[in-house]
Regions:
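Conserved core of the PLP fold type I
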Residues: 67-220
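Conserved PLP-binding active-site segment in aminotransferase class I/II-type PLP enzymes
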Residues: 1-21
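N-terminal small-domain helix-loop-helix segment of the aminotransferase-like
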Residues: 14-109
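Walker B catalytic acidic pair
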Residues: 224
Length: 226
């Protein structure tokens, strides 16, 4: 990352800059799933009739799936075929990503776990985290209590719509104090359920890009749980 995307590297937290995928059992296990067609000695698992052993009372509710697809250990970052299909969907729905260097998506154990990973990878003590003033407590726990980030909010609504100007003004304000800013874009907003109009979405993109062009390092987090 430091060589191919130095700007991104500087946005990572101290922990994020040191994280790596260990080349032990996780890597070897992933390679074995792909290449070990006869023997796989990387994992201990009880087999019966060339299939993982399981309880009938569990499989009775999962007949739509093959036992080999649901009972063995799942890869830590998600099943490769799911991740590839997910990336293909992203590229289809976002043509502007074509030709860009992006990573394969990874799976997480629900929303707060995903936010926690983002927080660990990008948020240092004292980093500003900008979000609307309508939010649930898991944001405070994840970005403030755990990562020691500074939560700063703006009024969610203005004149019956999303407060785009308030968002941009707040990012610019804290960006002058510290040039790295984490922006949480949670749409549909939880708990209000509000989704920006197309015009509001375009104004958000334009405003954030304009601030980025001025030198503010913006980490835009799309929290789209729905």
């Amino acid at each position: 990352i430091e060589e191919q995307a130095p700007a991104v590297f500087t946005m990572l937290s101290k922990l994020g800059q040191e994280l790596y995928m260990p080349k032990g059992i996780l890597t070897q296990g992933a390679e074995a799933k792909e290449k070990a067609h006869k023997f796989n000695a990387t994992i201990g698992i009880a087999m019966e009739n060339n299939s993982p052993m399981y309880l009938d009372c569990i499989y009775d509710n999962l007949k739509a799936f093959k036992p080999t697809d649901i009972f063995p250990y799942a890869p830590s970052s998600g099943k490769p075929e799911l991740r590839k299909a997910w990336q293909a969907k992203m590229l289809k729905e976002n043509p502007s990503l074509k030709g860009k260097l992006i990573s394969m998506p990874v799976t997480v154990n629900a929303l707060t776990h995903g936010l926690s990973i983002v927080s660990q990878m990008f948020c240092n003590e004292g980093d500003y985290v900008v979000m609307p003033d309508k939010f649930w407590g898991n944001y405070r726990l994840t970005f403030s209590t755990i990562s020691d980030g500074v939560l700063t909010t703006f009024p969610t609504f203005h004149e019956g719509g999303f407060n785009v100007d308030g968002l941009i003004k707040k990012v610019e304000e804290v960006g002058k104090l510290k040039p790295k800013v984490i922006v949480i874009l949670n749409f549909p907003n939880n708990p209000t359920g509000y989704t920006p109009t197309l015009d509001e979405a375009n104004r958000i993109v334009y405003g954030l890009r304009n601030l980025a062009d001025k030198g503010i390092k913006i980490i835009s987090v799309a929290d789209d749980d729905y």
